Amino acid sequence: MLLPIPDVLSPAQLSQLRAQLDVADWADGRITAGHQSAQAKDNAQLPEDSAVAREAGALVLEALARSSTFFSAVLPRRIYPPLFNRYSGGQSFGYHVDNAVRYDRSRGGAEAVRTDVSATLFLSDPDSYDGGELVIEDTYGTQSVKLPAGHLVIYPGTSLHRVMPVTRGARVACFFWAQSMLRDAAQRRLLFELDVSIRRLTQDTPGHPSLIQLTGVYHNLLRQWADV
């Protein structure tokens, strides 16, 4: 399921993030790439252990925690600490599939995170740069994504995708992965659609007795499928 989620960041949060990132020290983005994807990757990235990356990542996680749409669509069990990249001067990232497992060393040790869901949070105004579209190959064909600053897109971690060359300005974004309680993308889509329908029915016909039954169906399916 490819899903844009608008306004994950407020204007104040976006301004704070950009102020931090504008003065940050960027490094070669290939530091987090696997062997194959490193050959296709050309961008700049904040080192994961930098103070700016940790502070900015914490802000993003706080924003995600307030997004009911993100939670409903992803049903996250673990979220890999958010990372930040920048493309400019013709930089791009060729077609690749994200590593199946990432190792979170932010708390000491190395906690495995299965990358069920990939996410990109756009931090640059789309009018401030040319190119930089996130191109995703999914079940319904090729999707090109270039969203307003503060908007998020999520898509299955199994997807073949690329970032087109940025020929003017700079494209700054946050990216991360989530391990869902539901490994299967079709199950995630089904529960998301059911949750959205329940919410709409609650608004349109509050107190309808069928809502209790539908909510029970949702939770019983989650109980049957969830890996927690």
Curated annotation (Swiss-Prot):
Cofactor(s), by name: Fe(2+); L-ascorbate
Domain Fe2OG dioxygenase: residue ranges: 78-180
PROSITE patterns: FE2OG_OXY (PS51471)
One GO term of the biological process aspect: intracellular iron ion homeostasis
Coiled coil feature spans: none
Cofactor: how and how many bound: Binds 1 Fe(2+) ion per subunit.
Enzyme class: oxidoreductase
Keyword Iron: yes
The entry's keywords: Dioxygenase, Iron, Metal-binding, Oxidoreductase, Vitamin C
Disulfide-bonded cysteines: none
Binding of 2-oxoglutarate, residues: R171
GO MF term set: 2-oxoglutarate-dependent dioxygenase activity; iron ion binding; L-ascorbic acid binding
Pfam families: 2OG-FeII_Oxy_3 (PF13640), PKHD_C (PF18331)
Residues the record lists as binding Fe cation: H96, D98, H161
EC number: 1.14.11.-
Protein name listed in UniProt: PKHD-type hydroxylase XAC2942
